């Protein structure tokens, strides 16, 4: 039975939440948000935590690049958030008080427009919902809005990810790259690969996230739910855990696509290398921050995808890199995907290369062999970002 207005603590919560739900997922109007009873029945099997963990204070940037970023090996880094103000400021109590009247993105409508809710109503919903796949705050514009930009001062980008080559592009032209993330149990992200060949990092401040990562070469049809399994929640993490996860854990799962599983806890930072499939579900109330980035180690993957998917951005970015980081041009020049005349023409790059004001983002649904020196390319589709709900980011880690 759907949550009634008497279950919320604020008098307007029911109306505000119902309005957001109607805009974000109108297809559930008749079916209902809690019909499957996952709040009571969802119980994944015991975790097999197989990810390496490394003390982030005891490894250098060069060692990280050599051991994890270059070979594209997922890892959890510990200790990187120890001195963040977010540890004290990102509690549910403080967030719901300081930002109570600020709107945060918790979905998208059928036209790609942001669905937003005031923090005070989302907090009420977060604590009291029984939904099968709850609304999830995934907000990429928090650092640009005057009344929420303080959130960006509560954390700092870890040293391993500071050299983001997209920083050299004008801010309004680069794709969305950072998200404030907040959600209850059963919220999460469907299986996806991060956009434009980027890698991602995700630092968790509150709660626990369950991750499954699958190697880049795994076929899309193998890692995605089958058509008959999608039901009313086709693009939700909980659907994946109720369907594909059972196959992933079975002895019949191909050994060449062996998954990495883990439970990320408070203060831990997940590194997701370029191309890895990953799916996330929150085990309880969670608060996190996540960024997508391009470095010298994954530029050979990012550049061909950017040329193909965001050609005007690629021309602008190339000019900026030539001015500020000319040493990386040899990586770009080695990419056979780069059209020889595309970087020197005089066409404008001010329109389609600009990122949307609605937190949208480009992405792929499958491993795209868009690395330097490789010619075969698969079709791009829309999916999502580093740890991002497909319903929320359907255009863009």
Swiss-Prot record:
<keyword id="KW-0408">Iron</keyword>
<dbReference type="InterPro" id="IPR003347">
    <property type="entry name" value="JmjC_dom"/>
</dbReference>
<comment type="function">
    <text>Dioxygenase that can both act as a histone arginine demethylase and a lysyl-hydroxylase.</text>
</comment>
<feature type="compositionally biased region" description="Polar residues">
    <location>
        <begin position="334"/>
        <end position="344"/>
    </location>
</feature>
<feature type="domain" description="JmjC">
    <location>
        <begin position="146"/>
        <end position="310"/>
    </location>
</feature>
<feature type="binding site">
    <location>
        <position position="209"/>
    </location>
    <ligand>
        <name>substrate</name>
    </ligand>
</feature>
<dbReference type="GO" id="GO:0018395">
    <property type="term" value="P:peptidyl-lysine hydroxylation to 5-hydroxy-L-lysine"/>
</dbReference>
<dbReference type="GO" id="GO:0006909">
    <property type="term" value="P:phagocytosis"/>
</dbReference>
<dbReference type="GO" id="GO:0046872">
    <property type="term" value="F:metal ion binding"/>
</dbReference>
<dbReference type="GO" id="GO:0005634">
    <property type="term" value="C:nucleus"/>
</dbReference>
<dbReference type="Pfam" id="PF02373">
    <property type="entry name" value="JmjC"/>
</dbReference>
<protein>
    <recommendedName>
        <fullName>Bifunctional arginine demethylase and lysyl-hydroxylase psr-1</fullName>
        <ecNumber>1.14.11.-</ecNumber>
    </recommendedName>
</protein>
<feature type="binding site">
    <location>
        <position position="202"/>
    </location>
    <ligand>
        <name>2-oxoglutarate</name>
    </ligand>
</feature>
<dbReference type="GO" id="GO:0005737">
    <property type="term" value="C:cytoplasm"/>
</dbReference>
<keyword id="KW-0560">Oxidoreductase</keyword>
<keyword id="KW-0539">Nucleus</keyword>
<keyword id="KW-0804">Transcription</keyword>
<dbReference type="GO" id="GO:0033749">
    <property type="term" value="F:histone H4R3 demethylase activity"/>
</dbReference>
<feature type="binding site">
    <location>
        <position position="290"/>
    </location>
    <ligand>
        <name>2-oxoglutarate</name>
    </ligand>
</feature>
<feature type="binding site">
    <location>
        <position position="189"/>
    </location>
    <ligand>
        <name>substrate</name>
    </ligand>
</feature>
<feature type="region of interest" description="Disordered">
    <location>
        <begin position="334"/>
        <end position="383"/>
    </location>
</feature>
<dbReference type="GO" id="GO:0106140">
    <property type="term" value="F:P-TEFb complex binding"/>
</dbReference>
<feature type="binding site">
    <location>
        <position position="192"/>
    </location>
    <ligand>
        <name>Fe cation</name>
    </ligand>
</feature>
<feature type="binding site">
    <location>
        <position position="278"/>
    </location>
    <ligand>
        <name>Fe cation</name>
    </ligand>
</feature>
<feature type="compositionally biased region" description="Low complexity">
    <location>
        <begin position="345"/>
        <end position="358"/>
    </location>
</feature>
<keyword id="KW-0805">Transcription regulation</keyword>
<comment type="subunit">
    <text>Interacts with ced-5 and ced-12.</text>
</comment>
<keyword id="KW-0156">Chromatin regulator</keyword>
<keyword id="KW-0223">Dioxygenase</keyword>
<feature type="binding site">
    <location>
        <position position="194"/>
    </location>
    <ligand>
        <name>Fe cation</name>
    </ligand>
</feature>
<keyword id="KW-0479">Metal-binding</keyword>
<dbReference type="GO" id="GO:0070815">
    <property type="term" value="F:peptidyl-lysine 5-dioxygenase activity"/>
</dbReference>
<dbReference type="InterPro" id="IPR050910">
    <property type="entry name" value="JMJD6_ArgDemeth/LysHydrox"/>
</dbReference>
<comment type="similarity">
    <text>Belongs to the JMJD6 family.</text>
</comment>
């Amino acid at each position: 039975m759907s949550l009634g207005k008497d279950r919320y603590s604020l008098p307007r919560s029911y109306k505000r939440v119902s309005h957001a739900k109607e805009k974000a997922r109108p297809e559930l109007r008749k079916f209902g948000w809690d019909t499957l009873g996952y709040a009571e029945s969802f119980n994944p099997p015991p975790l097999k935590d197989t990810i390496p963990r490394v003390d982030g204070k005891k490894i250098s940037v060069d060692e990280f690049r050599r051991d994890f970023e270059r070979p594209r090996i997922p890892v959890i880094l510990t200790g990187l958030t120890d001195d963040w103000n977010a540890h004290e400021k990102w509690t549910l109590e403080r967030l719901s008080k300081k930002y109570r009247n600020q709107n945060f993105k918790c979905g998208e409508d059928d036209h790609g427009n942001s669905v937003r809710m005031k923090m005070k109503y989302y907090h009420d919903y977060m604590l009291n919902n029984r939904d099968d796949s709850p609304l999830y705050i995934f907000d990429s514009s928090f650092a640009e809005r005057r009344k929420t930009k303080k959130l960006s001062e509560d954390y700092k980008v870890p040293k391993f990810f500071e050299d983001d080559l997209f920083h050299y592009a004008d801010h309004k032209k680069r794709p969305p790259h950072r998200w404030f993330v907040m959600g209850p149990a059963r919220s999460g992200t469907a299986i996806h690969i991060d956009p434009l060949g980027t890698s991602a990092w995700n630092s968790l401040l509150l709660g626990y996230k369950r991750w499954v990562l699958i190697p880049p070469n795994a076929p899309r049809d193998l890692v995605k739910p089958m058509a008959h399994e999608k039901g009313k929640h086709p693009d939700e993490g909980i659907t994946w855990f109720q369907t594909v996860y059972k196959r992933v854990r079975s002895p019949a799962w191909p050994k060449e696509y062996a998954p990495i599983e883990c439970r990320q806890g408070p203060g831990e930072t997940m590194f997701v290398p370029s191309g890895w499939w990953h799916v996330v579900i929150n085990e309880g109330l969670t608060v996190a921050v996540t960024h997508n980035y391009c470095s010298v180690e994954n530029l050979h993957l990012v550049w061909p995808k950017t040329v193909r998917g965001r050609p005007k951005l690629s021309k602008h970015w190339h000019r900026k890199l030539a001015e500020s980081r000319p040493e990386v041009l040899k990586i770009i020049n080695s990419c056979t995907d780069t059209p020889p005349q595309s970087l020197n023409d005089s066409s404008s790059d001010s329109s389609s290369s600009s990122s949307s004001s609605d937190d949208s983002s480009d992405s792929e649904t499958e491993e795209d062999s868009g690395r330097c020196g490789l010619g075969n390319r698969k079709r791009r589709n829309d999916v999502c970002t580093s740890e991002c709900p497909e319903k929320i980011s359907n255009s863009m880690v």
